[in-house]
């Protein structure tokens, strides 16, 4: 789920409350490069505002942080504003940021990791992006890592951003891109 695909998916999101949540999900997943379970655990209380218009989210726990030391993840002004707008739209300022909906469009306490895959598949179909393979929660990590690689960001920085502790893990995400790197021999 590269930036180009992210843009296409956001463009098919409706303007209602569900579409607002879906746009937020897409931006949150792409920018943070987190696993589905980690995306679902972000809370409104985790949003931090620092000097010079810098914003971050606290990731309280991850697969590679078994001691719950947490990690500060810088985010864009756009994402910070999206979280604030979402908070106002659902009239909540605590608890899980991403939420599912009941039939009457009131919110449930939290979106589930499995729901992320369902939402991505639905948006992918609406955007007519069936030729790229099935999107899943891992697509955020892969696409953002590929975008960083395309910008010539060093592997070490990509690893830090994505939370990979070993080059082997990071390279698995980037391998498919490297295998088809559009190399042309003249």
Please name every model-derived segment:
Residues 3-36:
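Basic, Lys/Arg- and aromatic-enriched nucleic-acid-binding interface segment
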Residues 9, 25, 33, 39, ...:
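Mobile genetic element proteins and their domesticated derivatives, centered on retroelements
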Residues 15-20, 110-112, 134-135:
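N-terminal core-binding DNA-recognition domain of tyrosine site-specific recombinases/integrases
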Residues 29-53, 156-160:
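Short, charged phosphate-coordinating catalytic segments
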Residues 50-107, 119-126:
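Basic, alpha-helical nucleic-acid-contacting "clamp/cap" segments
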Residues 92, 117-160, 167, 179:
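Short, basic (Lys/Arg/His-rich) helix/loop patches that form interaction surfaces
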Residues 162-186:
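Catalytic-site neighborhood detector that most strongly recognizes the C-terminal catalytic loop/helix
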């Amino acid at each position: 789920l590269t930036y180009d695909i992210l843009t296409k998916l956001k463009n098919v999101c409706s303007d209602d409350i569900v579409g607002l949540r879906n746009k937020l999900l897409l931006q949150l997943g792409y920018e943070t490069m987190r696993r589905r379970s980690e995306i679902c655990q972000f809370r409104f209380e985790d949003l931090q505002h620092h000097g010079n218009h810098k914003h971050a989210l606290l990731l309280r726990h991850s697969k590679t942080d078994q001691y719950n030391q947490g990690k500060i993840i810088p985010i864009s002004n756009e994402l910070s504003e999206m979280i604030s707008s979402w908070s106002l739209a659902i009239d909540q300022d605590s608890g899980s940021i991403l939420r599912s909906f009941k039939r009457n469009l009131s919110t449930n306490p939290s979106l589930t990791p499995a729901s992320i895959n369902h939402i991505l598949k639905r948006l992918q179909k609406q955007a007519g992006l069936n030729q790229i393979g099935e999107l899943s929660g891992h697509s955020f990590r892969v696409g953002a890592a590929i975008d960083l690689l395309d910008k010539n960001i060093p592997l070490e920085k990509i690893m830090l951003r994505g939370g990979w502790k070993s080059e082997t893990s990071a390279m698995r995400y980037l391998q498919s891109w490297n295998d088809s790197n559009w190399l042309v021999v003249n």
